[in-house]
UniProtKB/Swiss-Prot annotation:
Residues 137-223 form the (+)RNA virus helicase C-terminal domain. PROSITE patterns: PSRV_HELICASE (PS51657). Belongs to the Tymovirales TGBp1 protein family. TGBp1, TGBp2 and TGBp3 seem to act together for cell-to-cell propagation. TGBp1 is the main movement protein that physically cross the plasmodesma with the viral genome. TGBp2 and TGBp3 would facilitate TGBp1 function. One of its GO terms (biological process) is transport of virus in host, cell to cell. It is found in: Host cytoplasm. InterPro entries: (+)RNA_virus_helicase_core_dom, P-loop_NTPase. Homodimer and homooligomer. Interacts with capsid protein. Interacts with host AGO1; this interaction targets the host protein for degradation, thereby suppressing the antiviral RNA silencing. One of its GO terms (molecular function) is ATP binding. This is Movement and silencing protein TGBp1. Pfam families: Viral_helicase1 (PF01443).
Length: 223
């Protein structure tokens, strides 16, 4: 436990008023350093094991990588970490649970630590997210552009949509696109998000994923 608690402090995660208990619950926004923290825990303490319901790491020569979790998995070893605990069914034996409630449906546990500062996207995106009700911050700057669909001559970066009408429009124009479920866990330099309804009417895990995949620029396109 001491290794994880030390790293949570080093990475700037905020302690909540929830009394410490087993398992430790950590909620973190995209780009907060969650995955890097878990990898550091594996390197620093060989008694720690980590598995995830998200995207697992590729095996390395040392064996210190985040492995894929199985449905119904039980924690093993002296200290077990489960990443993305909200994305699957798990059993007992885990000592530390990580996830992001904003990207998941359903109820979450009370957090002992939160990481709400993203180092991926910047303050322009954060302002949009905060206006939508998300408790999030950023350590950097980025660019957010808003365009009308008829101004969209050459879409930039990876195009994401979640509405059927937008999907049909993009198919009609033979434009390649992705759904939020296809890019969860991914990061791109530039993302173009195309939507019909106002963002306020789309609030939910899919929208949050779509608006948090970029590093430098987010283009919001509507009609």
């Amino acid at each position: 436990m001491e290794t994880v608690l030390s790293l949570l402090n080093e990475f700037g995660f905020e302690r909540t008023v929830e009394p410490l208990s087993d398992p430790i619950v950590v909620h973190a926004v995209p780009g907060s350093g969650k995955t890097t923290l878990i990898k550091q825990a594996l390197i620093r303490n060989n008694n720690i094991e980590a598995v995830t319901f998200g995207v697992p790491e590729k095996a390395n020569i040392h064996g210190t990588y985040i492995k894929k979790a199985r449905q119904g998995q039980r924690g093993r070893g002296n200290y077990s970490i489960l990443d993305e605990y909200l994305s699957g069914e798990y059993s007992t034996g885990f000592n530390c649970l990580f996830s992001d409630p904003y990207q998941n449906h359903g109820d979450c546990l009370r957090a002992h630590f939160i990481g709400r500062c993203s180092h991926r996207f910047g303050r322009q995106t954060v302002q949009i997210l905060r206006d939508l009700g998300y408790n999030i911050a950023s350590s950097k700057e980025d660019i957010v552009e808003k365009k009308n669909i008829f101004q969209l001559i050459e879409p930039e970066g990876v195009i994401i949509c979640l509405e059927k009408g937008v999907e049909d429009f993009l198919k009609w124009h033979s434009v390649e696109y992705k759904f939020p479920c296809q890019v969860r866990g991914a990061t791109f330099d530039i993302v173009t998000f195309i939507h019909e309804k106002p963002l306020e009417e789309l609030v939910g895990p899919d929208l949050f994923v779509a608006l948090t995949r970029h590093r430098s620029k987010l283009v919001l396109v509507s009609n």
